[in-house]
């Protein structure tokens, strides 16, 4: 496994791989890797000749400086995990290589509509930062496929739209959420939880699953389901932040023609903002 830190060296290897006709898979990450990331790597490994994992804590997608500063940087441990998964290249650039003039005046990629709804409404600029760094990585790595986790449901939808709109010839692979035995979705931010908070955290998944059953039963309105979920989260010791039930294919409000719904939940627990989602098939 080769660790690449500079753009010229990355371009040199990508040029060679392209000349050799290799199929390249990209797994973009911000590091602090866990089993959920490893699932992405395994999926990439099964689909391509060469796997490139990027590790870059992207300053453009953080809406708070303190959140950026405390995001865990664990490059050495991450590389050890990736080596065991037979990753070919780790691309770990410094911010000045990605944003030579800083992030304030940098050229950016914005995906209208989807960037400012839902999570985007509560985190201004976040999705613009995501689409910009992913676009940069696509241009640098030139992958045939790229793997993203379904835990970040809106992010995956945003990337699919960006790829379609920009004409990228890249297959986007969504990989199912990896959960702990108690149902908590794996996340780098789970590391912010204390031992006591970790015991409370699975309540988010339990409330979400209850919402799914209520939605299938069709006995309550979506507004009633959301209100009950907010109360239940608060009763369990979490602080409800944003709970939505949307059309899974458009992320718009549910309509009579919606075939699938997605439940999107976000709640605070101590210093950690936990998110999760669940897709529900709607009966005819």
Swiss-Prot record:
Main location: cytoplasm
Residues binding beta-alanine, per UniProt: 61
GO CC terms in record: cytosol
Pathway annotation: Cofactor biosynthesis; (R)-pantothenate biosynthesis; (R)-pantothenate from (R)-pantoate and beta-alanine: step 1/1
Reactions this protein catalyses: (R)-pantoate + beta-alanine + ATP = (R)-pantothenate + AMP + diphosphate + H(+)
GO MF term list: ATP binding; pantoate-beta-alanine ligase activity
Active-site residues annotated for this sequence: 37
Enzyme class per UniProt: ligase
InterPro entries: Pantoate_ligase, Pantoate_ligase_C, Rossmann-like_a/b/a_fold
Binding locations of ATP: 30-37, 149-152, 178, 186-189
Binding sites annotated in the UniProt record for (R)-pantoate: 61, 155
Complex and partners: Homodimer.
More info: The reaction proceeds by a bi uni uni bi ping pong mechanism.
Protein name: Pantothenate synthetase
């Amino acid at each position: 496994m080769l660790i690449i830190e500079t753009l010229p060296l990355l371009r040199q290897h990508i040029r060679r791989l392209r000349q050799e006709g290799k199929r390249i898979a990209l797994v973009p990450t911000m590091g602090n890797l866990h089993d959920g990331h490893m699932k992405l790597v395994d999926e990439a490994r099964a689909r391509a000749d060469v796997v490139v994992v990027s590790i870059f804590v992207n300053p453009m997608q953080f809406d708070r400086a303190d959140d950026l500063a405390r995001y865990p940087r664990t490059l050495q441990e991450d590389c050890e995990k990736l080596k065991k998964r037979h990753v070919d290249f780790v691309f770990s650039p410094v911010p000045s290589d990605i944003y030579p003039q800083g992030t304030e005046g940098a050229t950016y990629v914005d995906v209208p509509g989807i960037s400012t709804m839902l999570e985007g409404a509560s985190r201004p600029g976040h999705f613009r930062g995501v689409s910009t760094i992913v676009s940069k990585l696509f241009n640098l790595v030139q992958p045939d496929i790229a793997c993203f986790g379904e835990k970040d449901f809106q992010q995956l939808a945003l990337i699919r739209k960006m790829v379609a709109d920009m004409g990228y010839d890249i297959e986007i692979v969504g990989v199912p959420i990896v959960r702990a035995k108690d149902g908590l979705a794996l996340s780098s931010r789970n590391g912010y939880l204390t031992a006591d908070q970790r015991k409370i955290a699975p309540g988010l998944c339990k409330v979400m699953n209850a919402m799914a059953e209520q939605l299938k039963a069709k006995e309550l309105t979506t507004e009633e389901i959301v209100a009950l979920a907010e109360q239940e989260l608060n009763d369990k010791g979490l602080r409800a932040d944003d709970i939505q039930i949307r059309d899974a294919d458009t992320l718009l409000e549910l309509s009579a023609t919606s075939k699938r719904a997605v439940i999107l939940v976000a709640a605070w627990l101590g210093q950690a903002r936990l998110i999760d989602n669940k897709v529900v098939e709607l009966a005819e």
